[in-house]
């Protein structure tokens, strides 16, 4: 196959004019921008580049500055894709802060004025419909940016941009589907600043992780490779698990602003009733809530010091509340990406906050290792995802390594015995 390489004018961050809009960029963000433009300058027109940076590292800020610089130096347009409408609006807002005039392509958007814009922001499904209807002119799109690129919903749109440079950004370069590895759709991965470095340099809060062993052998793995909602609800709504949740909360989180993640709406409602009956300030949020309800709940959560918010999936991406002090994983997951997304919601740093607590009630810590583990090699995971996934321990293997401690009241009955053990 004949590949045409177009050489472009080099763009370095330090060569550009001083910005009067946007946010101040940190040195690691400037370095990432330089690396990305270096690839852009020396790669084929249709090169697909993936950039990894942890949640809280400022991916949106980085690609917004990239868009600003790109539009200044190239007579082409930019398209930014997201997988949720909330992210569309947030992305559009940040781009505007950087002085980038942009148009959100949603189901209600009129396209009569599309020629007046050089940057578009669109949700993947809406964009797919508009492109199949031939209602959006993409003939002049030179740069495509994909936020949360690990989601597979974006891959069906690549056929429309066969002559565009594609930049995918993600915190976890591991595809949401085993059948569609990211290495099939991206030519190269650039790994950004690590979680440990961001913590060391006071850009992220550190996580104090507490794991409570849970028997998970009753859980069923579904077609998507993760535990089914039905089997999770059966386990996490039983009295034993609800009691364990309350005990863990009282032991580690009592009086702290806490975000609880569940796998299933019924589980979250059970959790809501559990804490409400105990006299705690608690709210429940899932994807059936209206925009108004969601806004009111999140405003309440923000301003209430010791609030508890129990949720289902909806807050794993696009949610930024730095005042969160504790995260409870009241679920198990086989997804490394979801594990990092959930914990990342507590990692925003504040003047009086440099750490947060994580309660794991799904053996996720044992499955994936500590959040920000230096043992994670993102380049290897990107290139050989199956090798990584095959190395993740099964629930049976995890539970066989558990060490059970005898409760103090029972141990006191054998106070004259030096060595005591029991089998469960």
Describe the predicted segments one by one.
Residues 7-52:
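Conserved pre-motif I regulatory segment
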Residues 45-66:
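Walker A/P-loop
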Residues 75-95:
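Conserved Walker A/P-loop ATP-binding site and its immediately adjacent core
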Residues 105-114, 270, 280-312:
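Conserved helicase ATPase core of P-loop NTP-dependent helicases/translocases
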Residues 151-209:
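Post-DEXD/H (motif II) to motif III coupling segment of the RecA-like Helicase ATP-binding lobe
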Residues 189-259:
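Conserved interdomain linker/interface between the two RecA-like ATPase lobes of SF2 helicase motors
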Residues 308-311, 317-332, 338-345, 355-360:
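A short beta-strand element within the Helicase C-terminal
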Residues 346-376:
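Conserved segment of the helicase C-terminal RecA-like domain
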